[in-house]
Amino acid sequence: MNSFLRCVAAVLALCAAAPAPAQGAEEKDNIAGPYVPTPWVIVDEMLKLAGIRGEDVVYDLGSGDGRLVITAAKRFGARGVGVELQTELVELARIGAKHEGVADRVKFVQGDLFETDIKDASVVMLYLLPRFVTRLVPRLRAELRPGTRIVSHDYPLAPWPPDKELSMDVAEKEMISGTSWTRLYYYVVPARVQGVWELTLPRALADAPLVVQITQEPHAIGGLIHHGNAELFLRDLTVQGEGVRFGLLYRTRLIAFEGTVGGKTMTGEARAGSVREPWTARYLGPLQR
């Protein structure tokens, strides 16, 4: 940590020790936990886990002194946005960005992270208390583009299972939060595929389109086809980013599908034995409840 950031840390410690101004109930409810600076070794691991690239737009929701966004910009050339409710932290982050020479690549916004427009993010960083992390899950899945990466420090986005986890001991953290144990959770936002789809297979595999009903929740996804009197289930249906994979046992043949979701269409390749042919699907509408 350079001398400037040591100075920032000292100022923040004084701010934390000072009496806090009175807050209304609504404002207090949206402060997503006390300010706890992320140790630098964890900053490094979060950026590494997210696979930050120069073309990324990194959002830090509850950005504190801005260290994650500033480091992403300085080290990788990424652009970034920090969202923080506490005014003094926003000002410190802006000073830090200017000092580190990245003020043209990052901005810090004083605002409510639950109301901030996040659709431009390609990466989202979180270090919030569990109830606030859970509260964000519907927004993250509904508003972020498929393929957006999320890294959450210490608390998972329940009930959404992570794509990866990383655990470590960080001695510096024990002095800050009382424990050295650290866990990072990595997620890739899936394409939204819930609804009714018309699946068209090559004639070598099926002579008519099939209607597929897909249900998609943070913790589970499944697909069902009504075919005559039979119910056919999509096997191992997986959506990661814009990629989709599943299997289907149809007329005694196991067909493996791989493809890409593009809004209201899917396209890809179907494989059954030696047969490899293209497949498509088009969105017909929402599920009937």
Predicted regions and their residues:
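Active-site capping/gating segments
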Residues: P156-E198
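Glycine-rich SAM-binding Motif I of class I
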Residues: G66-I70
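Conserved SAM-binding motif I beta-strand of class I
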Residues: R79-E84
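Conserved class I S-adenosyl-L-methionine
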Residues: E55-G64
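Conserved beta-strand signature within the Rossmann-like core of class I S-adenosyl-L-methionine
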Residues: G147-A158
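S-adenosyl-L-methionine
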Residues: A20-D56, T87-D120
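Central antiparallel beta-sheet cores of small beta-barrel/beta-sandwich binding domains
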Residues: A191-R289
